[in-house]
Amino acid sequence: MHIPLSYISYAEEEIAEALDSLRSGSVTMGAKCLAFEKAFAQYSNSRHAIFLNSGSSANLLAWFALTNPTWKKPLQPGFEVIVPAVSWSTTIWPIVQSGGVPVLVDCSPDTLCIDIASVEAAISPKTAAVFPIQPLGNVCDMDRLTAICDQHQIILIEDSCQTLGSRYRGRMAGNFGL
């Protein structure tokens, strides 16, 4: 039996749209991208949506923005970020690249989301942020995470690449932190 490695999954309409973009000379950040960003922001009830080539780039951009000297209160080298141990290198490495120290904590065995009790136990005077990953469509307990971050004046940044369309108490994932 022959099982193909891959197959063409694009419809003719999608191919035509791609060719239209290529012919326009605007293959990145063009009118179609701007229209899609606007539509996605409306869909997700967000003020803004900015598209990048990957979640990895989004993570890097977030940490570099937070350490940029022109930001209202830039994070200083040595800041700590609480992250789940079930993670990716592209979650951890941008923190390190921007001068931070990742602090790994346990995850819930049922959801693979960051364990809230572990987050609370890991908070130190150097903790600047909590960076939960929302794996496989599972949204973390955002009520508790938000309350913890508010109580300790810690930044909350969600990595919601895997929860597109998921909601927590009616609110779209990705809309709880920065």
Q: Where are each of the predicted segments found?
A:
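Short clusters of hydrophobic/aromatic residues that line enzyme substrate/ligand-binding pockets
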Residues: L5, V27, I114, L164, ...
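Conserved active-site segment immediately N-terminal to the catalytic lysine
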Residues: E158-L178
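Structured helix-beta-strand junction loops
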Residues: S24, S46, P125-K126, Q151-H152, ...
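PLP-dependent aminotransferase-like
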Residues: N68-P135, V139-Q151, I155-S160, R167
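Phosphate-binding glycine-rich loop
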Residues: A31-E80, P94-Q97, L104-V105, R171
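N-terminal "arm"/small-domain region of PLP-dependent enzymes with the aminotransferase-like
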Residues: M1-S26, A31
